[in-house]
Swiss-Prot record:
Family indicated by similarity: Belongs to the imidazoleglycerol-phosphate dehydratase family.
Cofactor mode of binding and number, as noted: Binds 2 manganese ions per subunit.
Transmembrane segment boundaries: none
Enzyme Commission code(s) on record: 4.2.1.19
Protein name: Imidazoleglycerol-phosphate dehydratase 1, chloroplastic
Length: 269
């Protein structure tokens, strides 16, 4: 008896990626939901897991990841004055790579937290008049990071906009709430018990965030819930800020690429 050859059924075709910033997903073989690739200028190849509604494949195990193409949101700033020379690069869609050399060891450690917990790629190279004190370098680095963040965010289409995270570190706990609104405001409720951590003047923590807020145009609230160790309090602050910023900069697929504002615009002007 002759057996007819098996012909694999054709898979449904994906909708065109040009239809909208967030095209309607299609259902692939095995029930997986697949989002078509979308390219914005230069692109970065990332691995994204394609899951069924239950989060597993038909055999009860996670489905194999598929590749999608998304853009990298990048910002780069060079700030040169008679006091400092600062170069900052940030990738909001990074993997948590930190490369910081500021001349202020404790600040380098805090920028590592920003990269690691925000999953941002952060490059900061700075020289300055640290023979006087760390004030000018601390300020100008924060100003440059804020400006790079502003560049990377662009028109802010499709982002969550708001972020909220509380980070503990041993006895310390710090809550951060932020809004990428375009309106700069800082409320900082830290009570750091010592004047220095290593050689770093702890007054500069609030000044760092004020400078970053001024150029990025974010609303930022920092509240210390607990803590009596200065290092722990400051590090918990940077960790909470990183996670809140990560939440705010991530995309909300339900927004379909629209600006998250009833006014239809989020900007400094």
């Amino acid at each position: 008896m002759t057996t007819a050859p098996f012909v694999s059924p054709s898979l449904p075709r994906l909708h065109s990626a040009r239809a909208s910033p967030f095209p309607k997903p299609s259902v692939g073989s095995g029930g997986g939901v697949a989002f078509p690739a979308r390219t914005y200028g230069s692109s970065l190849r990332l691995r994204s897991a394609v899951m069924s509604a239950s989060g597993v494949g038909g055999n009860g195990s996670p489905m194999a990841p598929e590749e999608s193409t998304v853009s990298s949101r990048l910002g780069e700033v060079k700030r040169v004055t008679k006091e400092t020379n600062v170069h900052v690069k940030i990738n909001l869609d990074g993997t948590g790579v930190a490369n910081s050399s500021t001349g202020i060891p404790f600040l380098d450690h805090m920028l590592d937290q920003l990269a690691s917990h925000g999953l941002f790629d952060v490059y900061v190279k700075a020289t300055g008049d640290t023979h006087i004190d760390d004030h000018h370098s601390n300020e100008d680095i924060a100003l440059a990071i804020g400006t790079a963040l502003l560049q990377a965010l662009g028109d802010r289409k499709g982002i969550n906009r708001f972020g909220h995270f509380t980070a503990p570190l041993d006895e310390a706990a710090v809550e951060v709430i932020l809004d990428l609104s375009g309106r700069p405001h800082l409320s900082c409720g830290l009570s750091i018990p010592t004047e220095r951590v290593g050689t770093y003047d702890t007054q500069l923590v609030e000044h760092f965030f004020q400078s970053l807020v001024n150029t990025s145009g974010m609303t930022l609230h920092i509240r210390q819930l607990a803590g009596n160790n200065s290092h722990h309090i400051i590090e918990a602050t940077f960790k909470a800020f990183a996670r809140a910023l990560r939440q705010a900069t991530e995309y909300d697929l339900r927004r379909q690429g629209t600006i998250p504002s009833s006014k239809g615009v989020l900007s400094r002007s």
